[in-house]
């Protein structure tokens, strides 16, 4: 007998309980030690039950504006009265995030402006308030028509072109509130190890394709640097670096360009909804990536973090600039107020404040990485091509693990989750595989992993609508079953991509514990993304995510729909 002594002098037979240090040993631990103790039920819904599930109108597929906070009141509260003209601007996140001292420049500007007590031509006191929403999501909300702020300030002018394409014509008031730029942040040490030499957009792409750099990108439907990156990459792939000229929509139909994009996507190490989330993962695990796409402001801040002093920026694309526009429904008094605010924030004192938060003075871009601005048709095709080819020709396997314990009945959690799954089901590329497991007292396999088509989409919809909440929280029992299903799929298809999305509103109250699964998770080769749903202690979920270099997302009933849709769109 082979034995080791652990705390308290207990002898452990390592032949019966072998260490977990590989994918195969993780499977052995699951199949021989953990799964035999778990009772798994099956309750599959026939696809026919989904016949009564009607598609939601576009406006209902998007979050309500009230799900996002308002910022800007100098006293911390909103001063509504008949003598106040409140002017709402929907702003990109990097400059209006009230939670980050280094990312709240426009919030500071609004508070200072409001303290001036300026009045409009009709005598009302002007109050500017900001609602921070990712640029791409905000554009979708404006097009859908359910949200009508007075102004819009995305991170770049690309989103204005997409608005025009969809029939919403903005009026430019300020071409640039603050300077910024898209960059690839590259680890200097990793670049030297890959061969060194001139650090530029083209060589970075070549070494990523060669597997010499681990690179992260973000979703071009949401993220300005992500859209800028895809446009620049396709522009260079189409051969414009030498001859110049704008990328044309017809060029994106070429098989050679589509195959090149697919090959590149095979080499991308991570895709996250936004670069802000990817940066947080990178900060926790500096060795996870060698390079990542982001805004230059964020690069400057990341460079000051411990362990990131060797970062070098590779600028590309057009100036981002954060334009300010009025919208077709903006009233005359609102437009005048926006114009005043635009002049205020572009004044020298406010630009100095912006520089103190790492905005301004964007790095110059060489002509070989600076495509001319694209129109909405081209940008829309860039987004669609990314969605079609982002999996790099590999099958993506997504297992959904959903908490249906009794607490999910509170605060409309379960009904909003059903709605979110209904909407997100439309974001899945056909041919990828999706499965659904629920857990309360025990895990229940509701939909085994299966290729996604019209039939399986109908089954997913029917299954989602049939979810019911009751019982305790056997989180790790469910996690063990979901991991096993995905690891079996990986054995059959070692070239696939494997994701486990875990949604829970509480801590485990029965069954296995994290310690039972930690080494299995570590060696599973599965990307795990937990969602802490509601007002919960997310400490355990953060531990789960950290094991596989992931991030925890926080959701609530108001915002679970866009969150799950974004994760599906990015992963599937």
Tell me what each language-model feature is.
Residues 19, 23-43, 62-64, 357-400, ...:
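Acidic, polar low-complexity linker/tail segments
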Residues 19-222:
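N-terminal segment of the mature folded domain
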Residues 174-183, 218-221, 258-264, 305-331, 335, 344-364, ...:
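Periplasmic-binding protein-like
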Residues 206, 393-452, 468, 478-480, ...:
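Von Willebrand factor
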Residues 241-312:
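Ligand-binding pocket segment of bilobal, Venus flytrap-like solute-binding proteins
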Residues 433-466, 483-492, 510-516, 538-546:
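Short beta-strand-loop
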Residues 504-558, 565-567:
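VWA/integrin I-like adhesion module and closely mimicked acidic/polar interface patches used
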